[in-house]
């Protein structure tokens, strides 16, 4: 709509690639491959897993692989680009069709499988729990309510392990989770009420 605003600023000097990935999972840094400079050898030394049919979430797949190969990520102190978000952009929520949702579900499952294969998933359980909570409620915003029992069961379990994550959730989100903890039926009724309420 032509409105300009500054993105959130993530202030750091340097950190490991895996630590930067954890910051992304915690919504403090960005997935976008194009907003970073990458050493050429990160792409050339080992083959990358590439999924040419993915049009939504390809940054996740590339960033995870590049960051796990990166010994160090360094920040620069000045703005290097402007990002224009258009109404017809691929990631705009009003254009979120079934194909993009399939991509969304794919990269979520790919991410955890890849981290497990690389032997680093145990270092990132809390970060992945936060990522899963945010993605589950994003699905609800998009009205793509599938596999909800599985998603809510995982959130309930994750909140037992990491109760501090409740601080990142809204009162409404906590009420929804509490309703699902009581029963699937009550959870669905509560969720339907909030969706209708807007």
List the predicted regions and their residue ranges.
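Residues that form generic nucleotide/phosphate-binding pockets
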Residues: 23-24, 114, 158, 192
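Amphipathic alpha-helical repeat scaffolds of TPR domains
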Residues: 127-139
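Donor-binding/catalytic cores of nucleotide-activated saccharide
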Residues: 1-74, 81-99
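A structural signal for short, well-ordered beta-strand segments and their strand-loop junctions
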Residues: 74-76, 124-125
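Membrane-interface aromatic/basic loop that binds lipid-linked glycans or pyrophosphate carriers
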Residues: 142-198
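Catalytic core of nucleotide-sugar-dependent glycosyltransferases
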Residues: 78-87, 93-120, 139-142, 146-163
């Amino acid at each position: 709509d032509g409105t300009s605003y500054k993105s959130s600023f993530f202030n750091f000097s340097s950190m490991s690639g895996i630590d930067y990935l954890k910051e992304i999972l915690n919504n403090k840094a960005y997935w976008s491959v194009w907003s970073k400079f990458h050493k050429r050898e990160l792409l050339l030394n080992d083959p990358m897993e590439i999924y040419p049919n993915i049009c939504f979430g390809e940054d996740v797949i590339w960033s995870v692989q590049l960051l796990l190969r990166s010994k160090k990520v360094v920040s620069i102190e000045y703005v290097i680009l402007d990002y224009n978000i258009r109404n017809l952009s691929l990631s705009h929520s009003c254009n979120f069709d079934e194909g993009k949702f399939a991509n969304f579900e794919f990269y979520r499952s790919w991410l955890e499988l890849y981290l497990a294969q690389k032997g680093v998933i145990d270092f990132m359980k809390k970060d992945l729990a936060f990522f899963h909570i945010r993605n589950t409620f994003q699905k609800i915003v998009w009205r793509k309510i599938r596999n909800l029992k599985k998603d809510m069961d995982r959130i309930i379990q994750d909140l037992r392990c990491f109760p501090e994550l409740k601080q990142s959730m809204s009162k409404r989100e906590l009420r929804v989770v509490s309703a699902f903890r009581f029963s699937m039926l009550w959870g669905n009724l509560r969720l339907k009420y909030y969706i209708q309420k807007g």
